[in-house]
Design a protein with these regions (language model features):
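Structural beta-alpha unit
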Residues: 23, 74-107, 114
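Glycine-rich, Arg-bearing micro-motifs that act as flexible, cationic patches
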Residues: 109-128
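Intrinsically disordered or low-complexity boundary/linker segments at protein termini
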Residues: 1-19, 79, 131-141
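General small-molecule cofactor/ligand-binding pocket signal
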Residues: 35-37, 83-87, 138
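A short acidic, glycine-rich active-site loop
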Residues: 54-66
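Short conserved AdoMet
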Residues: 28-29, 76-77, 134
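Small/aliphatic-rich secondary-structure junction motif
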Residues: 3-50
Length: 141
């Protein structure tokens, strides 16, 4: 049983949490903290950033935070301690950085079977998190 669980999710993709959330609950010790993480991709280095209005990334982070709060209210009302977090940047790095900052005992992350050539060659976000994590990672398919 774990006391501080980090669950990275993508609100636009229910498969990122539909199976992982019950698993995160299942490995939680009584009174555990469940931390939900959403990530806004870094657009600063991308060519598209020059076409976006000023403050677009900040607005995206605020919108994501509001969505995560709604998600937590709908799905975690019975959890004693839950918090939502928004990170910014490359997904695997943001997950690992947040886990370090929180001192998470475990990362519970959804993965999907590789379904395209890029995923097979480069690897999924879950694969990168597993490779570089300094704490247990529970991958849910």
């Amino acid at each position: 049983m774990f006391h501080k669980i980090l669950l990275p999710i993508d609100l636009d993709h229910p498969e990122s949490w539909e199976k992982a959330l019950p698993i995160a609950r299942g490995v939680s010790a009584p009174g555990a903290e469940l931390h939900i993480l959403g990530i806004v991709h870094d657009l600063g280095a991308a060519m598209i950033a020059s076409f976006l209005p000023d403050g677009a990334e900040q607005k995206a982070m605020e919108k994501l935070k509001a969505g995560l709060v709604d998600f937590a209210n709908a799905n975690l009302a019975d959890v004693a301690t839950s918090e939502v977090h928004v990170a910014h940047g490359h997904v695997p790095e943001a997950i690992l950085r947040t886990a370090d900052t929180l001192g998470a005992d475990v990362i519970v992350i959804a993965s999907h079977p590789p379904d395209d050539l890029t995923t097979r060659l480069v690897g999924s976000n879950a694969d990168k998190v597993v490779r570089h994590a300094t704490r247990p990672v529970l991958v849910v398919r």
